[in-house]
A protein has these predicted regions:
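Hydrophobic alpha-helical transmembrane segments of multi-pass integral membrane proteins
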Residues: 1-393
Length: 393
Protein backbone atom coordinates (compact mmCIF):
# COMPACT_ATOMS: atom_id res chain seq x y z
CA UNK A 1 0.00 0.00 0.00
CA UNK A 2 2.91 2.37 0.56
CA UNK A 3 3.54 2.77 -3.10
CA UNK A 4 -0.02 3.81 -3.84
CA UNK A 5 -0.45 5.94 -0.75
CA UNK A 6 2.60 8.11 -1.42
CA UNK A 7 1.26 11.38 -2.80
CA UNK A 8 2.72 13.34 -5.70
CA UNK A 9 1.49 15.56 -8.52
CA UNK A 10 1.66 12.45 -10.75
CA UNK A 11 -0.82 10.51 -8.59
CA UNK A 12 -3.87 9.10 -10.37
CA UNK A 13 -7.06 11.15 -10.16
CA UNK A 14 -9.85 8.87 -8.95
CA UNK A 15 -12.71 11.33 -8.46
CA UNK A 16 -15.47 10.38 -6.04
CA UNK A 17 -18.30 12.72 -5.04
CA UNK A 18 -18.82 10.87 -1.78
CA UNK A 19 -15.10 11.09 -0.97
CA UNK A 20 -14.84 14.80 -1.81
CA UNK A 21 -17.77 15.67 0.45
CA UNK A 22 -17.06 13.15 3.20
CA UNK A 23 -15.23 15.66 5.43
CA UNK A 24 -15.05 19.45 5.41
CA UNK A 25 -11.32 19.73 4.83
CA UNK A 26 -11.53 18.10 1.39
CA UNK A 27 -13.60 20.64 -0.59
CA UNK A 28 -12.69 23.66 1.51
CA UNK A 29 -8.92 23.15 1.41
CA UNK A 30 -9.04 22.51 -2.33
CA UNK A 31 -11.15 25.59 -3.06
CA UNK A 32 -9.17 27.73 -0.62
CA UNK A 33 -5.97 26.97 -2.51
CA UNK A 34 -7.58 27.54 -5.91
CA UNK A 35 -9.06 30.80 -4.68
CA UNK A 36 -5.70 31.89 -3.24
CA UNK A 37 -4.34 31.76 -6.79
CA UNK A 38 -7.37 33.48 -8.38
CA UNK A 39 -7.50 36.15 -5.68
CA UNK A 40 -3.87 37.12 -6.12
CA UNK A 41 -4.07 37.01 -9.92
CA UNK A 42 -7.01 39.42 -9.95
CA UNK A 43 -5.26 41.68 -7.45
CA UNK A 44 -2.04 41.72 -9.48
CA UNK A 45 -4.05 42.71 -12.56
CA UNK A 46 -5.84 45.43 -10.57
CA UNK A 47 -2.48 46.86 -9.50
CA UNK A 48 -1.54 46.99 -13.18
CA UNK A 49 -4.68 48.96 -14.04
CA UNK A 50 -6.84 46.10 -15.33
CA UNK A 51 -10.04 46.55 -13.32
CA UNK A 52 -13.16 44.41 -12.91
CA UNK A 53 -16.70 45.47 -12.07
CA UNK A 54 -17.13 44.58 -8.42
CA UNK A 55 -19.61 44.95 -5.57
CA UNK A 56 -16.70 45.97 -3.33
CA UNK A 57 -14.25 48.83 -3.87
CA UNK A 58 -10.99 47.36 -5.18
CA UNK A 59 -8.79 47.50 -2.05
CA UNK A 60 -11.71 46.41 0.14
CA UNK A 61 -12.33 43.39 -2.10
CA UNK A 62 -8.68 42.34 -1.75
CA UNK A 63 -8.73 42.47 2.05
CA UNK A 64 -12.28 41.11 2.41
CA UNK A 65 -11.64 38.11 0.20
CA UNK A 66 -8.32 37.26 1.82
CA UNK A 67 -10.10 37.05 5.18
CA UNK A 68 -13.71 36.09 4.41
CA UNK A 69 -12.92 34.09 1.28
CA UNK A 70 -9.57 32.31 1.48
CA UNK A 71 -8.96 32.21 5.24
CA UNK A 72 -12.59 31.45 6.04
CA UNK A 73 -12.46 28.44 3.70
CA UNK A 74 -9.36 27.09 5.46
CA UNK A 75 -10.82 27.66 8.94
CA UNK A 76 -14.13 26.09 7.88
CA UNK A 77 -12.40 23.02 6.50
CA UNK A 78 -10.34 22.71 9.67
CA UNK A 79 -13.28 23.12 12.08
CA UNK A 80 -15.62 20.82 10.14
CA UNK A 81 -12.93 18.15 10.47
CA UNK A 82 -11.34 18.87 13.85
CA UNK A 83 -14.61 19.23 15.76
CA UNK A 84 -15.47 15.70 14.68
CA UNK A 85 -12.14 14.48 16.08
CA UNK A 86 -12.59 16.42 19.32
CA UNK A 87 -16.18 15.26 19.91
CA UNK A 88 -16.34 11.86 18.21
CA UNK A 89 -19.48 13.02 16.38
CA UNK A 90 -20.33 12.74 12.70
CA UNK A 91 -19.86 16.12 11.02
CA UNK A 92 -21.63 17.76 8.12
CA UNK A 93 -21.04 15.71 4.97
CA UNK A 94 -22.59 14.72 1.66
CA UNK A 95 -25.19 17.03 0.13
CA UNK A 96 -25.28 19.25 3.21
CA UNK A 97 -21.55 19.91 3.00
CA UNK A 98 -21.82 20.42 -0.76
CA UNK A 99 -24.53 23.05 -0.19
CA UNK A 100 -22.35 24.91 2.31
CA UNK A 101 -19.43 24.84 -0.12
CA UNK A 102 -21.69 26.13 -2.90
CA UNK A 103 -22.78 29.00 -0.64
CA UNK A 104 -19.14 29.93 0.00
CA UNK A 105 -18.48 29.78 -3.75
CA UNK A 106 -21.47 32.01 -4.47
CA UNK A 107 -20.10 34.57 -2.03
CA UNK A 108 -16.90 34.74 -4.08
CA UNK A 109 -18.51 34.99 -7.52
CA UNK A 110 -21.64 37.11 -7.03
CA UNK A 111 -19.70 40.38 -6.48
CA UNK A 112 -18.64 40.23 -10.14
CA UNK A 113 -22.11 39.43 -11.51
CA UNK A 114 -24.96 41.85 -12.37
CA UNK A 115 -27.11 41.13 -9.32
CA UNK A 116 -28.62 43.38 -6.69
CA UNK A 117 -26.08 44.45 -4.02
CA UNK A 118 -28.43 43.25 -1.28
CA UNK A 119 -28.37 39.75 -2.78
CA UNK A 120 -24.56 39.72 -2.66
CA UNK A 121 -24.63 40.79 0.98
CA UNK A 122 -27.29 38.29 2.08
CA UNK A 123 -25.56 35.35 0.38
CA UNK A 124 -22.15 36.20 1.81
CA UNK A 125 -23.54 36.87 5.29
CA UNK A 126 -25.43 33.56 5.35
CA UNK A 127 -22.25 31.47 5.43
CA UNK A 128 -21.04 31.93 9.01
CA UNK A 129 -24.43 31.30 10.69
CA UNK A 130 -24.68 27.98 8.85
CA UNK A 131 -21.09 27.09 9.77
CA UNK A 132 -21.91 27.91 13.39
CA UNK A 133 -24.93 25.60 13.26
CA UNK A 134 -22.78 22.81 11.81
CA UNK A 135 -20.16 22.90 14.57
CA UNK A 136 -22.29 23.90 17.59
CA UNK A 137 -24.47 20.78 17.78
CA UNK A 138 -21.63 18.23 18.07
CA UNK A 139 -19.78 20.43 20.57
CA UNK A 140 -22.87 20.71 22.79
CA UNK A 141 -23.57 16.97 22.49
CA UNK A 142 -20.01 16.19 23.53
CA UNK A 143 -20.12 18.55 26.50
CA UNK A 144 -16.54 19.88 26.19
CA UNK A 145 -17.48 23.53 26.44
CA UNK A 146 -13.93 24.80 25.95
CA UNK A 147 -14.43 24.15 22.24
CA UNK A 148 -17.32 26.64 22.21
CA UNK A 149 -14.64 29.30 21.89
CA UNK A 150 -14.57 28.50 18.16
CA UNK A 151 -18.32 29.10 17.92
CA UNK A 152 -17.74 32.50 19.52
CA UNK A 153 -14.99 33.26 17.02
CA UNK A 154 -17.27 32.36 14.12
CA UNK A 155 -19.92 34.64 15.59
CA UNK A 156 -17.41 37.49 15.77
CA UNK A 157 -16.42 36.86 12.16
CA UNK A 158 -20.09 37.04 11.15
CA UNK A 159 -20.39 40.37 12.99
CA UNK A 160 -17.27 41.80 11.35
CA UNK A 161 -18.53 40.71 7.93
CA UNK A 162 -21.84 42.43 8.65
CA UNK A 163 -20.01 45.70 9.34
CA UNK A 164 -18.28 45.47 5.96
CA UNK A 165 -21.53 44.91 4.08
CA UNK A 166 -23.39 47.64 5.97
CA UNK A 167 -20.69 50.04 4.82
CA UNK A 168 -20.76 48.87 1.20
CA UNK A 169 -24.57 49.20 1.18
CA UNK A 170 -24.26 52.73 2.66
CA UNK A 171 -26.31 51.74 5.68
CA UNK A 172 -23.46 52.33 8.15
CA UNK A 173 -20.71 54.30 6.38
CA UNK A 174 -17.07 54.03 7.48
CA UNK A 175 -17.56 50.68 9.22
CA UNK A 176 -15.72 48.48 6.70
CA UNK A 177 -12.33 49.42 8.14
CA UNK A 178 -13.46 48.26 11.59
CA UNK A 179 -14.89 45.06 10.13
CA UNK A 180 -11.72 44.16 8.23
CA UNK A 181 -9.29 44.90 11.05
CA UNK A 182 -11.57 43.28 13.60
CA UNK A 183 -11.80 40.14 11.47
CA UNK A 184 -8.03 40.06 10.98
CA UNK A 185 -7.58 40.20 14.74
CA UNK A 186 -10.09 37.38 15.22
CA UNK A 187 -8.31 35.24 12.62
CA UNK A 188 -4.91 35.86 14.22
CA UNK A 189 -6.34 34.98 17.65
CA UNK A 190 -7.74 31.73 16.23
CA UNK A 191 -4.31 30.96 14.77
CA UNK A 192 -2.64 31.68 18.11
CA UNK A 193 -5.01 29.31 19.91
CA UNK A 194 -4.94 26.50 17.34
CA UNK A 195 -1.20 26.91 16.84
CA UNK A 196 -0.66 26.77 20.58
CA UNK A 197 -2.55 23.49 20.68
CA UNK A 198 -1.14 21.67 17.67
CA UNK A 199 2.39 22.93 16.99
CA UNK A 200 3.97 21.53 20.21
CA UNK A 201 1.80 18.41 19.87
CA UNK A 202 2.88 17.73 16.28
CA UNK A 203 6.51 18.44 17.19
CA UNK A 204 6.46 16.07 20.16
CA UNK A 205 4.97 13.28 18.06
CA UNK A 206 7.46 13.71 15.23
CA UNK A 207 10.71 14.25 17.17
CA UNK A 208 12.03 11.62 19.62
CA UNK A 209 12.90 13.13 23.02
CA UNK A 210 11.55 16.48 21.85
CA UNK A 211 13.40 19.33 23.60
CA UNK A 212 10.66 21.95 23.40
CA UNK A 213 9.13 22.96 26.73
CA UNK A 214 6.41 25.54 27.29
CA UNK A 215 7.04 28.44 29.68
CA UNK A 216 4.19 28.53 32.18
CA UNK A 217 4.04 32.29 32.70
CA UNK A 218 4.13 32.90 28.93
CA UNK A 219 1.33 30.39 28.35
CA UNK A 220 -0.81 32.17 30.95
CA UNK A 221 -0.17 35.66 29.58
CA UNK A 222 -0.06 35.32 25.80
CA UNK A 223 -3.78 34.98 25.04
CA UNK A 224 -5.03 37.62 27.54
CA UNK A 225 -2.43 40.09 26.23
CA UNK A 226 -3.46 39.24 22.66
CA UNK A 227 -7.13 39.91 23.43
CA UNK A 228 -6.32 43.23 25.13
CA UNK A 229 -4.08 44.24 22.22
CA UNK A 230 -6.74 43.43 19.63
CA UNK A 231 -9.51 45.22 21.53
CA UNK A 232 -7.33 48.28 21.93
CA UNK A 233 -6.54 48.26 18.20
CA UNK A 234 -10.25 48.71 17.53
CA UNK A 235 -10.45 51.55 20.05
CA UNK A 236 -7.18 53.51 20.08
CA UNK A 237 -4.90 51.99 17.40
CA UNK A 238 -2.63 55.05 17.20
CA UNK A 239 -2.14 55.60 20.93
CA UNK A 240 1.37 55.15 22.28
CA UNK A 241 0.26 52.32 24.54
CA UNK A 242 -1.10 50.47 21.48
CA UNK A 243 2.45 50.13 20.18
CA UNK A 244 3.57 49.08 23.65
CA UNK A 245 0.94 46.34 23.78
CA UNK A 246 2.02 45.11 20.35
CA UNK A 247 5.61 45.01 21.58
CA UNK A 248 4.63 43.04 24.68
CA UNK A 249 2.61 40.59 22.58
CA UNK A 250 5.53 40.20 20.15
CA UNK A 251 7.86 39.43 23.07
CA UNK A 252 5.49 36.82 24.49
CA UNK A 253 5.05 35.19 21.08
CA UNK A 254 8.80 35.13 20.49
CA UNK A 255 9.30 33.49 23.89
CA UNK A 256 6.51 31.03 23.15
CA UNK A 257 7.76 29.92 19.74
CA UNK A 258 11.32 29.92 21.07
CA UNK A 259 10.33 27.59 23.91
CA UNK A 260 8.98 25.13 21.32
CA UNK A 261 12.18 25.11 19.29
CA UNK A 262 14.23 21.99 18.70
CA UNK A 263 16.77 22.26 15.90
CA UNK A 264 15.76 18.86 14.57
CA UNK A 265 12.44 20.34 13.43
CA UNK A 266 14.36 22.27 10.75
CA UNK A 267 14.76 19.00 8.84
CA UNK A 268 10.99 18.39 8.85
CA UNK A 269 9.13 20.81 6.52
CA UNK A 270 5.74 19.92 8.00
CA UNK A 271 7.05 21.24 11.32
CA UNK A 272 9.23 24.21 10.38
CA UNK A 273 6.50 25.73 8.22
CA UNK A 274 4.18 25.84 11.26
CA UNK A 275 6.85 27.16 13.60
CA UNK A 276 7.81 29.68 10.91
CA UNK A 277 4.23 30.86 10.47
CA UNK A 278 3.89 31.40 14.21
CA UNK A 279 7.19 33.27 14.21
CA UNK A 280 5.88 35.54 11.42
CA UNK A 281 2.92 36.52 13.60
CA UNK A 282 5.43 37.55 16.27
CA UNK A 283 7.38 39.49 13.63
CA UNK A 284 4.18 41.20 12.52
CA UNK A 285 3.49 42.55 15.98
CA UNK A 286 7.12 43.52 16.44
CA UNK A 287 6.90 45.59 13.25
CA UNK A 288 3.61 47.05 14.53
CA UNK A 289 5.33 48.11 17.75
CA UNK A 290 8.17 49.78 15.83
CA UNK A 291 6.03 51.64 13.25
CA UNK A 292 6.42 55.12 14.81
CA UNK A 293 10.20 54.79 15.01
CA UNK A 294 10.86 53.03 11.70
CA UNK A 295 8.47 55.31 9.79
CA UNK A 296 7.02 52.33 7.93
CA UNK A 297 3.64 51.88 6.29
CA UNK A 298 1.14 49.92 8.43
CA UNK A 299 0.73 47.60 5.44
CA UNK A 300 4.18 46.19 6.23
CA UNK A 301 3.09 44.63 9.52
CA UNK A 302 -0.31 43.66 8.09
CA UNK A 303 1.34 41.68 5.31
CA UNK A 304 3.74 40.08 7.78
CA UNK A 305 0.63 38.76 9.54
CA UNK A 306 -1.22 37.77 6.36
CA UNK A 307 1.40 36.57 3.87
CA UNK A 308 3.76 35.28 6.56
CA UNK A 309 1.58 34.23 9.47
CA UNK A 310 -1.70 33.25 7.84
CA UNK A 311 -0.06 32.10 4.59
CA UNK A 312 2.51 29.77 6.13
CA UNK A 313 0.20 28.41 8.83
CA UNK A 314 -2.67 27.68 6.44
CA UNK A 315 -0.48 26.08 3.77
CA UNK A 316 1.32 24.04 6.43
CA UNK A 317 -1.87 22.89 8.14
CA UNK A 318 -3.59 22.04 4.86
CA UNK A 319 -0.57 20.04 3.75
CA UNK A 320 -0.47 18.03 6.97
CA UNK A 321 -4.20 17.50 7.50
CA UNK A 322 -4.73 16.45 3.88
CA UNK A 323 -2.11 13.72 4.30
CA UNK A 324 -3.22 12.32 7.64
CA UNK A 325 -6.96 12.43 6.97
CA UNK A 326 -6.71 10.75 3.57
CA UNK A 327 -4.85 7.75 4.98
CA UNK A 328 -1.39 8.72 3.78
CA UNK A 329 1.92 8.80 5.66
CA UNK A 330 2.99 12.18 7.03
CA UNK A 331 5.70 12.51 4.42
CA UNK A 332 5.53 15.79 2.55
CA UNK A 333 5.55 15.42 -1.25
CA UNK A 334 8.85 16.75 -2.59
CA UNK A 335 7.26 19.48 -4.69
CA UNK A 336 5.65 20.96 -1.58
CA UNK A 337 9.11 21.80 -0.23
CA UNK A 338 9.30 24.18 -3.19
CA UNK A 339 5.82 25.53 -2.38
CA UNK A 340 6.87 26.44 1.16
CA UNK A 341 9.98 28.21 -0.10
CA UNK A 342 7.91 30.08 -2.70
CA UNK A 343 5.72 31.44 0.08
CA UNK A 344 8.82 32.58 1.97
CA UNK A 345 10.01 34.42 -1.15
CA UNK A 346 6.58 36.05 -1.48
CA UNK A 347 6.88 37.18 2.13
CA UNK A 348 10.36 38.62 1.63
CA UNK A 349 9.27 40.51 -1.49
CA UNK A 350 6.10 41.91 0.07
CA UNK A 351 7.28 42.71 3.58
CA UNK A 352 11.02 42.96 4.02
CA UNK A 353 12.07 44.42 0.68
CA UNK A 354 9.09 46.72 0.11
CA UNK A 355 9.66 48.27 3.51
CA UNK A 356 12.63 50.08 1.98
CA UNK A 357 12.46 49.55 -1.81
CA UNK A 358 9.25 50.74 -3.46
CA UNK A 359 9.43 49.02 -6.84
CA UNK A 360 6.28 47.81 -8.67
CA UNK A 361 7.96 44.61 -9.87
CA UNK A 362 8.27 43.48 -6.24
CA UNK A 363 4.47 43.42 -5.96
CA UNK A 364 4.40 41.24 -9.07
CA UNK A 365 7.10 38.97 -7.66
CA UNK A 366 5.26 38.57 -4.37
CA UNK A 367 1.98 37.78 -6.13
CA UNK A 368 3.68 35.32 -8.50
CA UNK A 369 5.37 33.33 -5.74
CA UNK A 370 2.17 33.31 -3.64
CA UNK A 371 0.25 31.91 -6.64
CA UNK A 372 2.97 29.37 -7.32
CA UNK A 373 2.92 28.14 -3.71
CA UNK A 374 -0.82 27.51 -3.61
CA UNK A 375 -0.93 26.35 -7.22
CA UNK A 376 1.57 23.62 -6.35
CA UNK A 377 -0.67 22.59 -3.46
CA UNK A 378 -3.64 22.24 -5.81
CA UNK A 379 -1.72 20.19 -8.37
CA UNK A 380 -0.17 17.96 -5.71
CA UNK A 381 -3.12 17.39 -3.39
CA UNK A 382 -6.11 17.26 -5.72
CA UNK A 383 -5.78 13.46 -6.19
CA UNK A 384 -5.90 12.95 -2.42
CA UNK A 385 -8.72 15.41 -1.78
CA UNK A 386 -11.15 14.09 -4.42
CA UNK A 387 -10.39 10.36 -4.08
CA UNK A 388 -11.27 7.76 -1.42
CA UNK A 389 -8.80 7.24 1.43
CA UNK A 390 -5.57 5.55 0.37
CA UNK A 391 -5.77 3.04 3.25
CA UNK A 392 -9.26 1.79 2.32
CA UNK A 393 -9.51 -1.23 0.13
Amino acid sequence: MASTSQLSYRSNLNFSYSALFSLGFRPFFLLAAVFAVVLMLIWALELRGITFANYYPSILWHSHELIFGFTTAVISGFLLTAVGNWTGKVMLHGHGLAALVLLWFAGRTLPFLPVEPLVVAVVDLAFYPLLIAAITKPILQNGKMKNMVFVIFCGLMALMNLLVHLDVLNIAPNMAHLGIYGALNVVVLVMLIIGGRVIPFFSERAIPDYKGRSITVVEKLVLPVAVITFLNDLWQPLALWAYGLSGLLALLLLLRVGSWFDRRLLSNPLLWVLHGGYLMIALGFLLRALLPWLQLSPFIYIHALTVGGIGLLTLGMMSRVALGHTGRPLKLPQVMHLAFYCLLVALVCRVLVLAWIQKPFLYDMSAMFWMLAFGLFVLTYIPALVSPRADKG
